[in-house]
Amino acid sequence: MNAYFDDDHAVAVMGTELNVHGHAWAVEEGVAELRAATYPQYGLMPASFGIVVAPRAQFEQTIARFEVAAGLPSPRPGGEWGKASSLAERSYLFITALREDDVEDVIRWAHRGGFGTVLIGGDWSRSHGHHEINTAHFPDGLASFQRACRRLHDAGLRVGLHFLAAAVYLGDPYVTPVPDRRLVIDARGALGEAIDGEADFVPLAEPPAEFAAEDGGYMGRGTYVRIGDEIVQYSALSLEPPYGLLGCVRGALGTVASAHPAGQAVEHLHRSYGYFLYDLDSDLADEVIGNVCRVADAVEADMLYFDGSELLQGDHWYYNAKLQSLYHQGLANKDTFLQGSSYSHASWHLISRMASADGHGDVKGYLDERLPWLVGYEHNLMPADVGWYYVYEPTVTADQFDYILQKCLGYDASISVHTNPTQHAIHPEMGEIFDLVAEYERLR
């Protein structure tokens, strides 16, 4: 946020353009500078910022006034400044695998738990990228999804859409059968000699030192390269002569294996959390974001959750803000409640609440590890959400939720119960858990 405040006074230095990096810098013990900077790669100009000074008790209201005066986004979901809104205080029910036929059941459980919003899991989308409606869950496509959301609204519930904000799934038409040229590339090479469509060794002119050495799983960069209109998956690198990619699967991800001439570009496709990224500096960003915003507008979504917005293509402070700003610009309702998995200096103005993380396994120990994050959110004047706590297995108990909810009360943080309609019917402690959530929500 780039601010300092104590019990009496407050000051912030806030950039007013996406290319302005606001950050605090420790000069010496007990002394810090609030800085605003621009950099050539993102544009030295415009280089505008504002200085906000106020009594501590009036700081938030003064920032809200500054946003309007400076032309910054200043969402007011429900008619209130986002971070001060009642919507930022209310807990929400996160439902995955929602089908149109499940809506009445979800309404009953949402009311029982005292939730004000139902966040619909990202499987409403058949494939991230094109974001067509998942007809396995909503048989009539968008019309079915609209009916489901309308029923939630009619029941007095707000509707949220969860999705992976920067994602293009590996099976999406932007990837297969012909990979789009506007996917993020993080390393490049060139063929050292021509290859046919069957070669399992891809020779390179130089050592592929910048390519991922291994797949890396969920957190890895992956081992996919694009050569022309073909995607190739390799299993190892050869960093000594002959340089190249070993153990290659040709025509990966449904692309067509083909011959390529010497000198052809070999481009490493950057993978993040198991999916590819669209280039935020290309018009593919407008296409993918437009696909989501059209659905959000059509169902009159009250909330969007930008998941996966921390592992992007470059400097987080810039690309996180660019990503979330493009979504905000694409929405008809500029007062949509926005939440995400991360924020930066510029996107701080957009985000109305921050979640801690996904609670699973030893949820008590996990939450204890995450509690310092909630303090950090408070220091950035960001309302806290302890995050998503799963109810998918019988090992998740009401006792565990009682512990989590005590922390919600102490830290004045919302919670999201993360489950699906099948678990509503079979989990032995589902009713007790939802009753506890409702009780603590009233207390808080």
Per-range role (PLM):
Residues 86-189, 270-315, 321:
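Aromatic-lined carbohydrate-binding/catalytic grooves of carbohydrate-active enzymes
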Residues 319-444:
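Active-site-proximal substrate-binding groove within the catalytic cores of carbohydrate-active enzymes
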Residues 67-99, 158, 219-226, 242, ...:
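Mobile, glycine- and charge-enriched loop segments
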Residues 58-77, 111-119, 144-187, 335-368, ...:
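Glycine-rich, aromatic-flanked loop segments that form ligand/cofactor-binding clefts
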Residues 120-121, 160-162, 228, 235-237, ...:
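Generic beta-strand/beta-sheet core signal
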Residues 165, 169-257:
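Autoprocessing Asn-cyclization modules and mimics
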Residues 125-131, 166-171, 232-234, 311-315, ...:
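Flexible loop/turn segments at secondary-structure boundaries
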Residues 1-118, 151, 155-159, 302-303, ...:
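Carbohydrate-recognition beta-sandwich/jelly-roll modules
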